[in-house]
Curated annotation (Swiss-Prot):
Subunit structure comment from the entry: Monomer. Interacts with RD3.
Enzyme class: transferase
Reactions listed under catalytic activity: GMP + ATP = GDP + ADP
Gene: GUK1
UniProt-recorded name of the protein: Guanylate kinase
Organism, scientific name: Sus scrofa
């Protein structure tokens, strides 16, 4: 049957990736493990180091990237983000399906590795809905909002590239989007349960 493949979730900020991911990890906590990314940005209120992100300095992160310790990394809004090999190995060491939350640049980088994950893109029903969601967060300035929306538009265009994603989920209703996500991962969930992660 083979061991379960990792899962790469991508999609614009505000599309609902984190919410879907939280639901998946809550419902199947012994099957899925989240690969915690590194970032050089400051923590937002309520974020914990080692749980939401590993918050590191630019110097440390650049040194580790140069040493080849990262599967993928990207720069956004002046901050570095990336997935370290150690973070993925830590999840796999617990016999869990590793879930990575990465941007499109990250997806392209992972395509060059031997990770062979399932690629899933989560997108909002429209850019208007996305703008509404981002405004409700109250964490964006007008400038950063415009940047995020421009990036989202570009991502949504690129996601149509043949062969880039195995599945595109349009998150117009959380329940429907979550059902589609679980459906897409049902084979991997079965494999994981068969190898004794129940």
């Amino acid at each position: 049957m083979g061991s379960p493949r990792p899962v790469v979730l991508s999609g614009p900020s505000g599309a609902g990736k984190s919410t879907l991911l939280k639901k998946l990890l809550q419902e199947h906590s012994s099957i899925f493990g989240f690969s915690v990314s590194h970032t050089t940005r400051d923590p937002r209120p309520g974020e914990e180091n080692g749980k939401d992100y590993y918050f590191v300095t630019r110097e440390v992160m650049q040194r580790d990237i140069a040493a080849g310790d990262f599967i993928e990394h990207a720069e956004f809004s002046g901050n570095l983000y990336g997935t370290s090999k150690a973070a993925v190995r830590a999840v796999q060491a617990m016999n869990r399906i590793c879930v990575l939350d990465v941007d499109l640049q990250g997806v392209r980088n992972i395509k060059k590795t031997d990770l062979q994950p399932i690629y899933i893109f989560v997108q909002p029903p429209s850019l208007d809905v996305l703008e509404q969601r981002l405004r409700q967060r109250n964490t964006e300035t007008e400038e950063s909002l415009a940047k995020r929306l421009a990036a989202a538009k570009a991502d949504m265009e690129s996601s149509k590239e043949p062969g880039l994603f195995d599945l595109i989920i349009i998150n117009d209703s959380l329940d429907k989007a979550y059902w589609a996500l679980k459906e897409a991962l049902s084979e991997e969930i079965k494999k994981a349960q068969a190898t004794g992660h129940s």
